[in-house]
Curated annotation (Swiss-Prot):
It comes from Homo sapiens. Belongs to the mitochondrial carrier (TC 2.A.29) family. Monomer. This is ADP/ATP translocase 4. ADP binds at residues 92, 104, 247. Residues 50-86, 143-190, 244-283 are mitochondrial matrix.
Length: 315
């Protein structure tokens, strides 16, 4: 007699629209704030990653490193060009991060139902990894065209509109869709899924796991939470960085008559053969600095959820 109501109550908790909506809001607001703050580093990282595949950047005009890029961008393109593509990035990142966080908690409920952390630690740990990876892969399917457009806008150099390849987000999507079809907006999607699972599994899983080991997870001091998040985002970013480099190189091919790479594997091989293994990590230090924004997202998300009095699911 008591089992059926309990089951319905569990289903209601699992698919609570109000809680899901608050998750979207909390994750989205935190993401928008942090991405705007680190937008200049984001652009430097993108340019260093794809300049070898960009027809707009000649070999002699390529950036020598992060410092050279930081100095030349305002001089050649204007100071506010550091935020070029930032609006598209915020639009893209809001649903991406919001969906990641929202789905993560729902997946946690699915994967971790009945799992005792003290008695089944490794099962609990793997459930955290699985929920993070599944959340990232699910949201990527929805927002990939926006991620693609943000990348192309971010590496579109030139001081004036007449020197740029795209006028804005809408123009970028329309031009690529017209020349390559919808498939062109999903160039590099396969390797993106691989990379996002690796990144999100460690990003969410390790953060939740480490925080869960603390005596009072919900009362963790801000600085401690930030330090944990910083270490997690740095390690996750370096681990998945080669996947990110390859996917962005693949993105650069859409809309081009002649393609440099036949596919993901060919891209991996050619980068290694012609540029060396270090090219997979070009811009990685910028990514470490950029990871500060990711760390802020994790911490702000918890604080925003506390503000809305949302249960953080045992963290």
């Amino acid at each position: 007699m008591h089992r059926e109501p309990a089951k319905k109550k569990a289903e209601k908790r699992l698919f609570d629209a109000s809680s899901f909506g608050k998750d979207l809001l909390a994750g989205g607001v935190a993401a928008a704030v942090s991405k705007t703050a680190v937008a200049p580093i984001e652009r430097v990282k993108l340019l260093l990653q794809v300049q070898a595949s960009s027809k707009q950047i000649s070999p002699e005009a390529r950036y020598k490193g992060m410092v050279d890029c930081l100095v030349r961008i305002p001089r050649e393109q204007g100071f506010f060009s550091f935020w070029r593509g930032n609006l598209a990035n915020v639009i893209r990142y809001f649903p991406t991060q919001a969906l990641n966080f929202a789905f993560k908690d729902k997946y946690k409920q699915l994967f971790m139902s009945g799992v005792n952390k003290e008695k089944q630690f490794w099962r609990w740990f793997l459930a955290n990894l699985a929920s993070g990876g599944a959340a990232g892969a699910t949201s990527l399917c929805v927002v990939y065209p926006l991620d693609f457009a943000r990348t192309r806008l971010g590496v579109d150099i030139g001081k004036g509109p007449e020197e740029r390849q795209f006028k804005g987000l809408g123009d970028c999507i329309m031009k690529i869709a017209k020349s390559d079809g919808i498939a062109g907006l999903y160039q590099g999607f396969g390797v993106s899924v691989q990379g996002i699972i690796v990144y999100r599994a460690s990003y969410f899983g390790a953060y939740d796991t480490v925080k869960g080991l603390l005596p009072k997870p919900k009362k963790t001091p801000f600085l401690v939470s930030f330090f944990i998040a910083q270490v997690v985002t740095t390690c996750s970013g370096i681990l998945s960085y080669p996947f990110d480099t390859v996917r962005r190189r693949m993105m650069m091919q859409s809309g081009e008559a002649k393609r440099q790479y036949k596919g993901t594997l060919d891209c991996f091989v050619k980068i290694y053969q012609h540029e060396g293994i270090s090219s997979f990590f070009r811009g990685a230090f910028s990514n470490v600095l950029r990871g500060t924004g990711g760390a802020l997202v994790l911490v702000l998300y918890d604080k925003i959820k506390e503000f809305f009095h949302i249960d953080i699911g045992g963290r």
